[in-house]
Regions:
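N-terminal strand-loop-strand
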Residues: 2-53, 172, 176
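Short, solvent-exposed aromatic-acidic interface loops
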Residues: 43-48, 424-438
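A short, acidic, amphipathic alpha-helical segment used as a generic capping/interface helix at domain edges
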Residues: 352-366, 370
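Beta-strand elements within well-structured catalytic alpha/beta cores of enzymes
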Residues: 43, 169-175, 308, 368-384
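Domain-level recognition of soluble alpha/beta enzyme cores
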Residues: 392-422
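Active-site-proximal alpha-helix that buttresses catalytic centers in soluble enzyme cores
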Residues: 56, 67, 167-341, 400, ...
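Charged phosphate-binding loop/patch that engages nucleotide di/tri-phosphates or the phosphate backbone
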Residues: 150-168
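Unchanged
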Residues: 58-149, 162
């Protein structure tokens, strides 16, 4: 069996981890930092005889942010959380491959931090791969680094520190997984008269309302057919010239009205059955439940410590595994709920409701609370994303709007400037949960 062809793009991830030289000092967003007051974490690779940033290849099906925090812990022993993304490094390898390394600003986490407890245990890298780790000042690190790309990353970190942009907060918007497709109920889906029933379309027995019934006895060829009842009056009899009082309903008219009423009742019953099969607030589907467990790694990588959720079932249920294992608290926010039924008709004060959602998002942006998660469904999520873009830098505002898929997160990194919060970077990440119900596409073979 021939060996598989190597991938031309090798994806790796790492972090520039920094801390204050004074362990009692706390970072404040927007506060300029003297580079001499911080230290950066470096690793020595005996194979290349160089100092570099901790990084490594992403495992099969592993999100890049998960690979970044895992590789840093394997190579240095430090559990970290990720901040703003840095410039992606690309360089050629042997065999026609290209290595792409994604970097983030990283900060160490205390051992008792909830985000640290959610991480999978790792094995330290062998000494043949990493034999030394050290904390160094940026000035010393610049002399130790051998790769020009690594020095550019350090210069970016130092510039952020001097400008008060090194410490940032994070707002994460999550779109919960989808609900399962409701099974078709045989009773509610059974057609009436051999086809789907609807008001004014069919009646029991298969005769369509408004269509021509079977001509009765005495009907003239080509004349409109009118149902007759044995022993009843001739429906084709000529009307008297002089106006007369309206005649009493005939048995045929009574039967027709009863049939029409039966159709309306049956249609209403079918709508009730459909509403039961497709509830307005469906629970999280089976695949969405699996995604909720894999979300723990994504949320832990950014150090999420608190979450807000809309009252919908899926928005709450997707956070259940994360909260159950001690990830943090979940606060339900009624203002983020979507009215049941048609939104335009259910919420007559749509503008006021949209203003409440935007105000909630703006309040979260102004807070300096580490990483905050918003699990929201429906139109409220779109409003929050729009509000985040409104606070963005020129690069964020000019970029295409973010459209989230089920189980996907949007991560907004916020700097607290003199004029208020500014979103300086936006990234999206997805869980890599495999869905056995969806067939995978096989790559075509070339012969």
């Amino acid at each position: 069996m021939p060996a598989p062809r190597p991938q031309r793009l090798v994806r790796s991830a790492g972090a520039l981890v920094w801390r204050f030289a004074d362990p009692t000092r706390v970072a404040v967003s927007g506060e300029p930092i003297d580079p001499a007051d911080i230290e950066v974490l470096m690793v020595h690779r005996p194979r290349y005889h160089d100092w570099s940033w901790p990084k490594g290849k992403a495992e099969n099906g592993e999100p890049l942010v998960g690979a970044a925090v895992r590789e840093v812990e394997e190579e240095t022993g430090h559990v970290i959380t990720l901040g703003v993304p840095l410039t992606t490094q690309r360089y050629r390898l042997g065999g026609g491959q290209t290595k792409e390394v994604h970097y983030w600003v990283g900060t160490p986490l205390p051992a008792d931090d909830p985000a640290a407890r959610l991480r999978a245990p790792v094995a330290r890298a062998p000494r043949t791969e990493i034999d030394q780790t050290t904390w160094a000042t940026p000035e010393a690190a610049a002399d130790m680094l051998t790769r020009r790309g690594d020095r550019r990353l350090l210069a970016d970190l130092v510039a952020r520190a001097c400008e008060g942009r090194l410490a940032t907060s994070t707002i994460i918007v999550l779109r919960p997984g989808a609900a399962d497709a409701a099974p078709i109920d045989a009773a509610s889906a059974a057609p009436v008269g051999g086809r789907a029933s609807a008001p004014g379309t069919s009646v029991s027995g298969g005769t369509a309302l408004g269509s021509a019934p079977t001509p009765g006895p005495g009907s003239a060829p080509g004349s409109p057919s009118v149902p007759t009842v044995p022993g009843g009056p001739d429906p084709l009899a000529a009307a008297p010239a002089a106006p007369t009082p309206r005649p009493a309903p005939t048995p045929a008219m009574v039967a027709s009205a009863a049939a029409r009423r039966a159709v309306q009742v049956e249609w209403a019953s079918s709508l009730t059955a459909e509403a039961a099969a497709h509830p307005a607030d469906p629970p999280l589907g089976r695949f969405g439940v699996r995604q909720s467990f894999d979300l723990i790694d994504l949320l832990s990588a950014f150090g999420v410590g608190r979450a807000f959720a809309s009252p919908s079932a899926r928005a709450r249920q997707v956070l259940a595994p994360w909260a159950a294992v001690g990830g943090g608290s979940v606060t339900l926010v009624e203002a983020l709920g979507v009215p049941v039924g048609d939104e335009a008709g259910a919420d007559k004060d749509a503008d006021a409701r949209a203003a409440r959602v935007r105000a909630f998002a703006a309040q979260r942006l102004r807070e300096q609370a580490g990483a905050t998660l918003l699990s929201v469904t429906g139109a409220a999520r779109d409003l929050i994303v729009e509000e985040i873009r409104a606070y963005g830098s020129s690069a964020i505002v000019g970029a295409s709007p973010v459209s989230l898929g089920h189980g996907q997160i949007m991560v907004a990194h916020v700097e607290q400037g003199t004029d208020g919060p500014v979103v300086v970077a936006v990234e999206t990440h997805s869980v890599t949960t495999k869905n056995p119900a969806v067939p995978t596409r096989r790559a075509s073979r070339r012969h």
